[in-house]
A protein has these predicted regions:
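An acidic- and aromatic-residue-enriched active-site/binding cleft used to recognize and process polar
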Residues: 106-108, 150-152, 216-218, 262-267
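Conserved, mostly hydrophobic/aromatic
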Residues: 18, 101, 138, 214, ...
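Alpha-helix-loop-beta-strand connector modules within alpha/beta enzyme cores
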Residues: 131-138, 235-254
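N-terminal/domain-start segments enriched in small and hydrophobic, helix-friendly residues
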Residues: 198-241
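Aromatic-lined carbohydrate-binding/catalytic grooves of carbohydrate-active enzymes
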Residues: 58-197, 206-210, 222
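Histidine/acidic-residue-rich catalytic or RNA/ligand-binding cores of hydrolases
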Residues: 113, 157-162, 221-226, 268-279, ...
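Active-site-proximal substrate-binding groove within the catalytic cores of carbohydrate-active enzymes
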Residues: 23, 243-443, 453, 457-465
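Beta-strand-rich recognition/accessory modules
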Residues: 1-55, 78-81
């Protein structure tokens, strides 16, 4: 038999008149058949019932662009009205109009230290007219404006900390200090109302289409250190209710808005959050470590199938990787091959060379065609994922309604065999017409032949995507 226990980790409390508690949402899916059928039943259910919609329609593939680390400064602490508008114009001029223009941490007064959160207004030295001109520029060009917030973590001595000490949860250490960060008390309805009004006003004034919320703090000690006796779990439960109410109110007040949930990259991906938000930034680890990303994508495609990847490469000429390479390789085709996800951030910079823009303009259409199939098709991993530079990596997607799909094979930087044979999903009675958008090659195979093996020979540190059409389903 199977024993399953779920619930809030710590809960031992009495309730006061008028209070409610909210239990964690769960889904239990029964199925018959093999793992592949279960995987794709979940994906179909997730797309239909969990993934938020954009103006009532499924969210399509999104290409994101931004200006990260300008002048060597942290994150987005050096963004200005001028350099943002100039960068958008440069990308458009080079044929790279994004779906999303992304401004992350650092647009507020923080003295070039993005972690100083709690001064929630645009840095007047960088944005003398607020963020409205950037948002209007995006709207004019048909681009969605994404803006980062982290309202729950409040840095010591910022405006919010000073103006509303009654909303600050602190953890006192053994020396009597209360650290650098506080947790905003979203269990408090007045605090919720204040935050709703603030962010709603910014969404409207700055023409924000995607509200991005981060959460770079471990909240449990703050909750547990500020609870009444016999009320263990109350602060966590009421805080969770508060943040869900905050999001729900933003969505009601701003039709067409959608939310990107980050939470230190890949946390807070529970079903209640995922019903309201998309984890565009699914991790803070390994953006340019191709073999690590392959394992991450393997899990994301199966469980939370809308996410974003970067076209970053942290490998060196000797075949070794840096954990966090501050001087990554220029964007190339391999970086795109390893960033095939429903959403993508091209790391071609706005002031990059014509050669780099040429790579992007070559690969972006291939990514978009593949991404559409990632969202409409069933998913078939074709290799074991061991996070090894010595392995090949392969996957397949096929739209069951149209019969269109693709097979991707990537040869990692130290994979020694010169050829690789995958065993794709195929109908033995069908015929498949294949094409490679990069080389222009075409071929035809029967389903019976495909079941025996699909063999690819490519150089180290390269990849190939073979699109196909199952004959009779055009």
């Amino acid at each position: 038999g199977v024993h399953l226990a779920v619930g809030q980790q710590y809960m031992n409390m009495y309730m006061k008149p008028g209070e409610t508690i909210r239990t964690p949402r769960m889904t239990l899916m029964g199925f018959t058949g093999d793992e592949s059928r279960a995987r794709n039943m979940w994906r179909r259910w997730y797309f239909k019932h969990i993934l938020p919609r954009e103006d009532g329609q499924p969210i399509p593939p999104k290409m994101c662009l931004h200006t990260w680390g300008i002048g060597g400064k942290q994150e987005f602490t050096a963004v200005t009205e001028e350099n943002q508008v100039d960068a958008i114009d440069s990308y458009i001029r080079h044929g790279m109009k994004p779906d999303i223009w992304w401004i992350d941490a650092g647009w507020y007064p923080c003295d070039f230290t993005w972690t100083t959160t709690g001064n929630w207004w645009p840095n007047p030295d960088h944005f003398p007219n607020g963020l409205g001109p950037v948002g209007k520029k995006c709207e004019k060009e048909g681009i969605q404006f994404l803006l980062w917030f982290e309202p729950e973590r409040v840095h010591r001595d910022t405006a919010l900390d000073k103006e509303h000490p009654e909303w600050m949860l602190r953890v006192i250490d053994e020396k009597g200090g209360d650290g650098y960060d506080r947790l905003l008390k979203l269990a408090d309805k007045d605090c919720q109302d204040w935050l709703i009004e603030l962010v709603d006003r910014y969404i409207k004034e700055y023409h924000i289409h995607i509200y991005r919320q981060d959460f770079n703090i471990a909240p449990l000690p703050y909750w547990m250190n500020n609870e009444e006796p016999d009320r263990v779990g109350s602060m966590e439960n009421f805080h969770t209710q508060g943040y869900l109410r905050f999001w729900d109110e933003l969505l009601v007040r701003n039709p067409g808005l959608w939310i990107d949930s980050c939470a230190s990259g890949g946390r807070r991906n529970d079903l209640e959050t995922m019903r309201r938000a998309v984890p565009l930034h699914y991790t803070d680890i390994g953006y340019g470590m191709h073999h690590i990303k392959q394992k991450q994508h393997r899990e994301m495609f199966e469980w939370i199938p809308y996410f974003r990847a970067h076209t970053m490469s942290w490998d060196q000429e000797n075949g070794e990787y840096d954990d966090w390479n501050r001087a990554p390789r220029p964007v190339d085709e391999f970086a795109y091959q390893c960033a095939m996800a429903p959403a993508i951030t091209s790391m071609v910079e706005y002031n990059d060379s014509d050669e780099r823009f040429a790579v992007a303009n070559k690969m972006d259409p291939i990514w978009r065609e593949a991404a559409e199939l990632m969202l409409s098709g069933d998913y078939y991993p074709l290799t074991e994922c061991r996070k090894s530079v010595e392995d090949y990596y392969a996957m397949q997607f096929e739209d069951p309604e149209t019969g269109k799909g693709f097979i991707q094979v990537v040869r990692n930087i130290k994979a020694e065999p010169d050829s690789f044979t995958a065993k794709p999903f195929a109908d033995p009675k069908a015929t498949y017409a294949f094409w490679d958008r990069v080389s222009g090659e075409t071929m035809t195979m029967t389903g019976e032949e495909l079941q025996k093996g699909f063999t690819v020979s490519i150089p180290k540190r390269s990849g190939v995507i073979w699109f196909y059409q199952k004959k009779g389903n055009e």
